[in-house]
Amino acid sequence: SFPTRRSSDLTKATIKGLILDLLQDPHYIGSQIEPIKLILANTFHLYLRPGSKIVQAAGGLHQFENWKDGLILTDSGGFQVFSLGLANQKFNDQKHTHKVGIKLTEEGVKFRSPYDGSKHIFTPENVVDTQCELGSDIMMVLDVCSPAGSDKKTIEKHIAMTHRRAKRAFEHFKPKYEEARGVLFPIVQGGSYLDLRTQSAEYLSQFAWDGIAIGGVSVGESRELIEQVKIGRAHV
């Protein structure tokens, strides 16, 4: 176990301009600050560049970025694809021609690389495989993140899909569980609706073998709503 922080440091599998040892050195970060034991690496960007198999061939993320004594959490990449959808809407509103081609289906989420326009699909299964290749300690399932301001009916639809994806992800991960370096977390959704978050947490508890994550926060809603969700999270 380890103490969690309000935020985790996000990397692209590298720390620039800083010796990694300093992140855990109290003389550098200050004696009042808990040494950093967990960093987050971005699955979406690592999948596209340099590619999870290249990271795997280099010995996994811990060897790749020389983070040998700490833990690494990887996200599913779903939020980044969600963000691409918002970017697509923004560009369309400004009458630009930039297209990122986001399409949410039962199979997964289809998108185009923002780097070269190539087509890709994230599924509950291949996202687990990608994170296993990266050598993550804490992995996340592919969920559906509802945009801020979504009505309750839309969020309920997204929660149902999130739950189906979690079931698929854990069925796929179960045979790998003993050999995998890391553990897999389901992600609770529900927007700002405490009743929906409670329902989501109750359903996903069957998959909380090692932990559970809270998703769909800080996606454009007001600070007041974020605080409400934080208070509700403690209740859930």
How should each PLM-predicted stretch be described?
Residues 5-177:
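Non-catalytic, usually N-terminal nucleic-acid engagement modules in DNA/RNA processing proteins
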Residues 172, 176-233:
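Glycine-rich phosphate/ribose-binding loops and adjacent secondary-structure elements
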Residues 31, 231-236:
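Intervening/peripheral non-core polypeptide segments
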Residues 1-7, 235:
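Short, small-residue-biased leader/transition segments that mark boundaries at the very start
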